[in-house]
């Protein structure tokens, strides 16, 4: 009964957030936000595919991780809680940063070696926020940073948080200095699966 009530509350809040997303997108369109390539100091490479959902793994150990646009740091994890024997999905990212962009897009960086910001911090495009590393299950794979981009949900539902639009298209543009916004791609995903936040919350 309590779980059903929780899901209902999350569903209602998700509807409010979706409306806020649309309203905020309208106001955001009136002022162009700046985007930058979010890795520096070390040359990085990244693929154009991912396991079974849209995301990008970026390789270039110890590269500086930068804020791709302006926004608020919503959440950080500064302790690597991943245990290989348990392999809990919510801990696989190790050290993480979740940025709620002013564009109403959520940017999730995981497997970091160092986190340089705190929840609630305001960041600007190109600000140094972390360092690429091998925390979480990257301890048994390879040093890299996972970048997931998604809509903003009421909470950090892991399934949506890890990614729902392809970052590489935007990384390609930002690397060339092209100010390409992911807002339209995010909005298309919301129209296709409007209940994704609450469905993910029910699975957590």
Model-assigned labels for residue ranges:
Residues 116-117, 128, 134-143:
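Short glycine/proline-centered loop/turn elements that form peptide/ligand docking sites
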Residues 88-94, 142-156:
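Short, compositionally biased
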Residues 8-16:
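Bacterial N-terminal signal peptides
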Residues 1-7:
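N-terminal Sec-pathway targeting helices
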Residues 2, 18-96, 125, 134, ...:
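Surface-exposed, glycine-biased beta-strand/turn segments
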Residues 59, 66, 101-127:
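Short histidine-centered loop motifs in beta-beta connectors
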Residues 148-178:
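Short peripheral tails and domain-boundary helices/loops at the edges of structured domains
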């Amino acid at each position: 009964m309590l779980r059903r009530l929780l899901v209902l509350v999350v569903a209602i809040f998700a509807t409010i957030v979706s409306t806020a997303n649309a309203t905020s997108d309208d106001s955001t369109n009136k002022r162009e936000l700046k985007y930058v390539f979010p890795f520096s100091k070390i040359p990085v490479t990244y693929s154009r595919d991912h396991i079974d959902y849209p995301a990008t793994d970026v390789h270039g150990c110890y590269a500086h991780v930068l804020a791709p646009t302006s926004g608020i740091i919503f959440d950080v994890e500064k302790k690597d809680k991943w245990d290989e024997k348990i392999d809990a999905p919510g801990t696989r990212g190790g050290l993480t940063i979740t940025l709620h962009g002013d564009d109403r897009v959520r940017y999730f960086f995981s497997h970091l070696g160092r986190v340089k910001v705190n929840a609630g911090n305001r960041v600007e495009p190109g600000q140094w926020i972390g360092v690429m590393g091998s925390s979480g299950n990257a301890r048994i794979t390879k040093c890299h940073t996972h970048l997931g981009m998604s809509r903003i949900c009421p909470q950090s539902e892991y399934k949506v948080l890890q990614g729902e639009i392809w970052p590489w298209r935007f990384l390609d543009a930002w690397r060339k200095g092209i100010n390409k916004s992911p807002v339209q791609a995010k909005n298309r995903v919301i129209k296709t699966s409007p209940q994704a936040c609450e469905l993910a919350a029910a699975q957590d």
